[in-house]
Regions:
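N-terminal active-site beta-alpha-beta segment that forms phosphate/nucleotide-binding
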Residues: 1-75
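Conserved phosphate- and dinucleotide-binding cores of soluble alpha/beta proteins
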Residues: 62-141
Length: 141
């Protein structure tokens, strides 16, 4: 049975072009799988950057609670720290950034802070972390 999350992951993989530099954040299971799928099927020269700082990990492990496990760094062919990802993106070198969000409007703006009134929210979210830098500077986010 094909699940909606499988279809979304395949659609995300299709967005990655051969030679793209691709970054995903924390708890980004579908983007991590999409990046690995794209590298195996049609984009072998895509560069996989991840939040622990690993580049093209050889033995990625999908954990239930995070996509930022140490094996993404331990088995990487190189290390590229998170602060360098921001710099790369601001210089125009980041092709794809997969970032999470809870609410999106028609213009693509992301809400990752609160649902409801800011001072008395129904739900308080973790925040956007680097989204404010990466969304406007990555070629595709």
């Amino acid at each position: 049975m094909i699940r909606p999350c499988d279809m979304i992951t395949v659609a995300m993989a299709r967005l990655i072009r051969d030679g793209d530099t691709v970054f995903h954040g924390v708890s980004s299971h579908m983007p991590m799988i999409a990046t690995l799928l794209a590298k195996r099927l049609h984009a072998p020269n895509a560069v996989h950057l991840n939040i622990p700082g690993g580049v093209d990990p050889e033995k990625p492990v999908l954990r239930a609670y995070t996509s930022a496990g140490s094996e993404l760094w331990d088995s990487a062919c190189a290390v590229f720290p998170l602060m360098d990802v921001f710099d790369l993106s601001m210089r125009g070198g980041l092709d794809v950034a997969f970032l999470s969000g809870v609410q999106f409007d028609r213009q693509g703006r992301v809400n990752a802070s609160v649902i409801g009134d800011y001072h008395r929210p129904k739900v308080r979210l973790p925040g956007g972390a680097g989204s404010a830098v990466l969304i406007p500077t990555a070629r595709r986010a």
